[in-house]
């Protein structure tokens, strides 16, 4: 699902070579004339979007953005406390996700597998030229400090199991400072 808008000029330039279901011109014309979609949409996606928007409205957009920033700052502090390096440089860091370079000797698939299988924590890998070199932690949406505490507790245990020296509880303590 995607929310989008296009200019009148872009609408005029829409060509007739299209797929049946993703016929953007047909969608727009149907919405203008009948206020509905041309085909049966994925109703659960609309309901999920509605719920997500209601949650943002309830929390307040500014509060949501501030919370995401606070979670991002706590994540970055926890990463540094473990002696790990951020990717990219912190000046370019996002408040939606944090990428972390693996320490030398820690292998991506093994690290993420242990996190998932032993601790039920999933972190994302990377793509392209940094695939296998970094992992990513998301901290937006309904992510909470409780989620971060559990994630970093699992990261500490996994790094320790893989032979990387970690001061037990250090990253969790760093996160607690932001709560």
Regions from the language model: what does each represent?
Residues 1-77, 81:
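Active-site C-terminal subdomain of aminotransferase-like
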Residues 6, 100-104, 139:
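Short beta-strand-to-loop capping motifs
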Residues 45-48, 52, 64-67, 71-75, ...:
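General structural feature for long, well-ordered alpha-helical segments within catalytic domains
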Residues 83-87, 121-126:
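A short linear hydrophobic-aromatic micro-motif
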Residues 85-118:
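Conserved PLP-binding catalytic core of the aspartate aminotransferase-like
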Residues 90-92, 128-131:
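A short beta-turn/loop motif at secondary-structure boundaries
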Residues 115-123, 156-159:
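A common structural junction motif
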Residues 129, 133-179:
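PLP-dependent enzyme catalytic core of the Aspartate aminotransferase-like
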